[in-house]
Amino acid sequence: MLRGQEERKYSIRKYSIGVVSVLAATMFVVSSHEAQASEKTSTNAAAQKETLNQPGEQGNAITSHQMQSGKQLDDMHKENGKSGTVTEGKDTLQSSKHQSTQNSKTIRTQNDNQVKQDSERQGSKQSHQNNATNNTERQNDQVQNTHHAERNGSQSTTSQSNDVDKSQPSIPAQKVIPNHDKAAPTSTTPPSNDKTAPKSTKAQDATTDKHPNQQDTHQPAHQIIDAKQDDTVRQSEQKPQVGDLSKHIDGQNSPEKPTDKNTDNKQLIKDALQAPKTRSTTNAAADAKKVRPLKANQVQPLNKYPVVFVHGFLGLVGDNAPALYPNYWGGNKFKVIEELRKQGYNVHQASVSAFGSNYDRAVELYYYIKGGRVDYGAAHAAKYGHERYGKTYKGIMPNWEPGKKVHLVGHSMGGQTIRLMEEFLRNGNKEEIAYHKAHGGEISPLFTGGHNNMVASITTLATPHNGSQAADKFGNTEAVRKIMFALNRFMGNKYSNIDLGLTQWGFKQLPNESYIDYIKRVSKSKIWTSDDNAAYDLTLDGSAKLNNMTSMNPNITYTTYTGVSSHTGPLGYENPDLGTFFLMATTSRIIGHDAREEWRKNDGVVPVISSLHPSNQPFVNVTNDEPATRRGIWQVKPIIQGWDHVDFIGVDFLDFKRKGAELANFYTGIINDLLRVEATESKGTQLKAS
């Protein structure tokens, strides 16, 4: 009997030790997984979640083993009861409970320490960890009465696992960002605790930066300034270097845009007109409201001041253009005058001499606007030997006087003509005033001066403000001049209705004059040896004289547009780009091989450095995304890459690269700027009145 009881006791101990050994091995495996998860915490965010979930998983594993061991103990208790040894089994169970209670407290303390370490490692995800820890503690509490016996052999193993965790470097402030977050640095709604947020902001700011070649030295939009008060004004009395050109070049804002070949060009033009450009300014919304297409019953034009377009050398417009001569403003790509009028703008194209000097053209422009018979001035006529009076203009604005202004837009030589006319209006012609005092008689109001506030803005397109080597080395040579004057002589026959602009020199056959007599008379004209013509005025010397004659008006907004259609060859010279108008290939190479490197880049006829601004007058660089409303200073727009001299007016019918929609956008943008000039002026008037 006693021997049987001893065997049963031995069996109970054997089973208890076996169960404890199994559970100890299980806890060792679980603790190993827990240590591995701790090592992965500092490098992988996904591993953090696994580490957070492991206490709960550990508890679940313990619970299953504890339930199995509990069942085995119950079976043993039943066997002991049947054999009469229940008392000893209970003693053993109570002893086991006492030990397991102490072990449970120790393990819970260790788990709490481990949770604190995990909480420190998580940083910004502490709240999530606390929730996971609380879940683990609740699971441990549920099984604390059943897993005590099995923990005896696992205490040392758990202690070793905690030692491994403590040996790992603690990184409480480091946050691991998932890869999908880094893939979107410009997200507008990043997490508040994401350290990539500042980078995202910088990335967004970088997208709004201006082109590196665009210098923004302007004052806030719509601010009226005087050139003398502008700290950013730079006098360009020193000749600009080649580096000065690169800062103007606008490669990003090239007008060329990818166009679907199947898209109707007329529809593109219509879209451009229906949705005029809106500049990216703080007042863009208010400005956009001022620019709207013509409504069905609208009679009042959208612009307050008429816009007058002035053609350049060789330009013929309106009824004065031959049948095969292209439409000067826009060609067949975009008929600028016609389309802008359809949109409700008051625009006009002036008709002045195609071969005349800037002086004669400026006088003609005045009478084109004001109306009346052209008076070139007694002093000027006597000095150069041509007739004083010319043709008579009807006038587009007979009441033109100070306070009633116009906008002037000139292409090529037209920009020079505009500047000289405005100078005469404001300061008069000293030679004519002196001649009038000495000889009496009549004097044109244009020459008396004192007519300020009659021009709101001056905009020049590819204008040779500083001249062109093409005129010096080609256009103003004796051979070319003879060809030009011979053409005028031929077109002056009595059967021709085309006026090339030299009638004041006698290039018009009289009604009763034979053609032979007409040829003899014209051959004696002083024009053959005179400098009072376009060929000379476009030279470097002729343009320099004009620059010295003109000054800046602090009440006028000045803007220039420049194109470049040349590239640097292997020897450092400029060659015409492919697609440059074929008639300008020779002149482009003449300019591109100039001895001065800064004078080589060109649009086929005009060097870039000449088109930017007059060399002796103040200027400031502006971007395409800001309103050009400053006064008393040349606002230099970024150079347009790939535009040659005639791309500004669209007459190159062989250039299929330049679309009518481009011209529509270009001229609509100019009109928008002119409307903003008017808005700025009205605002200034209201402020003065208040």
From Swiss-Prot:
Q: Which domain of life does this protein belong to?
A: Bacteria
Q: Which ranges are cleaved off as propeptide? A: 38-295
Q: Give the residue ranges for region: Disordered.
A: 52-266
Where does the protein end up? Secreted
MF-aspect GO terms: metal ion binding; triacylglycerol lipase activity
From the UniProt entry, list the residue stretches annotated as the region Hydrophobic: 311-690
The upper taxonomy is: Bacteria, Bacillati, Bacillota, Bacilli, Bacillales
Please provide the record's keywords in A-Z order: Calcium, Hydrolase, Lipid degradation, Lipid metabolism, Metal-binding, Secreted, Signal, Zymogen
Gene Ontology BP annotations: lipid catabolic process
Similarity comment: family membership: Belongs to the AB hydrolase superfamily. Lipase family.
Cross-referenced Pfam families, in alphabetical order?
Answer: Lip_C, YSIRK_signal
Q: What is this protein called?
A: Lipase 2
Binding sites annotated in the UniProt record for Ca(2+):
579, 644, 647, 652, 655
Source species? Staphylococcus aureus
Top EC category:
hydrolase
